[in-house]
Amino acid sequence: MSTYRKLAKKQALRLSMAIVTMTSGVMGWMATVHADGVTNIQKADSANAGTITTTNNVWTVAPDKVEGDIATNAFSKFTLNQNNIANLLLYKNGQNANKLVNMVNDRIDIRGTVNALKNATTIGGDVYFLSPSGMAVGRTGVINAGSITALTPSADWFDKHLDNGQAKISASDMDALKAGAIPLNADGSIVIDGRLNTQSGIHLRAPAITVGSAPDAAAALQSKADLDFTDLVNIGSVSAGLG
């Protein structure tokens, strides 16, 4: 077993960036990024299928529910292929949240552009991605948000916070997520070969974290208080429709 693998098994690595730009580097042990495939975004509860709409390669995802300052989604699958955009809304039926927790049963695979929207035209909000298996952001993948936190919780923790396809996240759970104080899946991994763009921080927590898994990977983690998302939210001729 390599030194990196031993270290990865002993403790989780955490990246916490307030104003950081990274273009390459490896942390933890090398993990395999999923092969290219079709976009497949499904809610865990079929009753919430109507919260996902698609127009011209743009997927608009309303939260399952908004309770106070917390919006939640529970997905069975979240695979976003290149040349596709997913707009994740932090609002629903006149209710607005500043935090969005996305719980995903399967490994998260992002090769398109994910935009977190605090209103119809503005990127923002603290966005959390939780999957026991982890997350891969491919070379063409982009996530735009106020802040980004990705974690690989233990299966036990994940199951306790998912009830009949509905996420159960309390204010105290949010405090634990923010502090990185939840148990992790020993086999979970996060691979970033694409770009994460935020205004108030990037936090990655998993037993294995890789930023730039290949020499030609265009991995970049960027967090700037005055970051302008105007040129980051679209993909070529595919418009996110943010006005």
What residue ranges belong to the model's regions?
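Extracellular and secretory-pathway beta-repeat/beta-biased strand scaffolds
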Residues: 2-243
